Amino acid sequence: MTNTITQLFKIKHPIIQGGMVWVSGWKLASAVSNAGGLGLIGAGSMYPEVLREHIQKCKKATNKPFGVNVPMLYPQIDALMNVIIEEGVTIVFTSAGNPKTWTSFLKNKSIIVVHVVSSVKFALKAELAGVDAIVCEGFEAGGHNGREESTTFTLIPMVKEQVNIPVIAAGGIGNGRGMLAAMVLGADGVQIGSRFAATPESSAHTNFKQTILDVKDGDTHLTLKELAPVRLVKNKFYKEIQELYQKNPTREELKDLLGRARAKKGIFEGDLVNGELEIGQIAGIIHKIIPVKEILEEIVNDFEALKKSFLK
């Protein structure tokens, strides 16, 4: 399949692996790229020199294109960007911030820039900033989301109607059926997170991977909107948040409860009780942990078969 996304990134399939914190290390990114998609290293949970190590290992593991995802709220973002430049990364996805801040700088270094958005307003701002493509993420997605709570199903056609750059759909996509639906809605490609988190190549703890398999519809919820909206599993930590909400908490009280390293505790260390378990709604269709290569093949084969059936 050839389209604007495969041509932009020089990849075989218009499938991008989300750059998830504590999940998307060099092993996952290189495996996705080797299988024909675009792998992303998630820099949001890495110190600059740790990111450098992951980039160098990824280069050794694949000769295919790969990228780095950088949340712009990261406190050492200048240092991360310096590492990205020094290591010759050619694709950068940015999120959680103003795309104007880094887009021109990166593009002047001949880097392809993609920004993650959650609304038409932010999509237009990203296009104006000069990004090469946008990821439109519906609030079905695990982890941090936009406050608008727009679903992928509604967001993609609304954005596609307004912008003239490639659109990548994210949130609630985990198989060929979801990919086909997103592209019928107007997406040029898809970004997939939770499905790739449940792989042997993912950096996540085995407890977290098993939780992805156990999650059913209704087991996750978007919360902490006063801080940074996040979709997580309804575990003990989530229940503590809800109990605090009953007392009309201040932002500071919510921050105190959140504390530090909650995501690391849940995703990387496997604490299913007190950790922040960032998992998307699509987990309800993920039933086993299988290698990245098999997932890509399954998604592409199902996509092609369903497309033929759909066209009949």
Question: What residue ranges belong to the model's regions?
Answer:
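Active-site entrance/lid segments in N-terminal catalytic domains of soluble metabolic enzymes
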Residues: M1-Q162, P166
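Conserved acidic functional residues
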Residues: V116, G171-G172
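Conserved active-site-proximal phosphate/metal-binding subdomains
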Residues: G146-I168, G174-K312
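Active-site metal-binding loops of divalent metal-dependent hydrolases
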Residues: M20, G172-I173
